Amino acid sequence: MNELKAKTQELLKKYRITPDPVHFGQHFLVEPGTIDVFVKTCSVTKESRVLEIGPGLGFITKGLLRKAESVTVFEVDMRFEKLLRDIQKEFKTLHFSISNILQNDDFNYDVVCGALSYSIFEPLLRKIFANEDFRYGVFIVSEKIEKDYEEHDSVLALLIEAFFEISFVKLLPKQFFYPVPRADGMLIALKRRNAVSARHLFLQQLFLQGDKKAKNALREGLINSSVNQAHVLTKKESRALLGELTNLRDSNESIFQCSKEFLKKIYDFFQSYGFDGATLP
């Protein structure tokens, strides 16, 4: 048994915590080299303000605290409060909240990071995609994110394509975690797109108008993406270009409720339509 796994089990026993993979997705990282890579990928400096979601037993948290100006932690499982208070005695720059990150609206940090289950990661991205305070994030998620992103047939994949540049940093074998999960993990980095092309503006509009029917969001997204072109599209022209997309049953749903097949058709249009690719001011 490696030392970090032994330390993990020791702390769990000390604080009388039994990991709960079902309700909280708790699989603790017990591979020390990956903790170092995670902290390094966060690129924190002594001026950095960091938001960490789900600190676990605090191994990554302490690595960040040694480098950053401050670290604010959100932990939904109240069993970890005593552990966090003990870490706070050692690191005065730690702030924590025993609450659900999805109820938080402040993402004005230099780095947002955490090891997250898919059940939290997708809702988190839905919450922060329109929040321009979010600039850079480092996350451990399921390795299936790479396949999902490549297939571009999910809300998560299109959200990432529209608003972020993604880097797949490191595949994490499931044996790196305790208790061992059913699938491998993936360390990723997300950076908000600064230069937005007409092509990506089209996708962004779909989500920024997510409360509208998909066919209306598609039409308005296409019109808005043409603003820097020689000719700004009319509603009639955009409907004609979108063709069957606006006639399919899913087009009457919000983009967040559309089927995988419809989302893939949107991505195919995104790939094939002749956007000018100009960078918007």
Task: Map each language-model feature to its residues.
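Catalytic cores of RNA-modifying enzymes
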Residues: 1-205, 256, 262-281
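An accessory alpha-helical subdomain
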Residues: 183-271
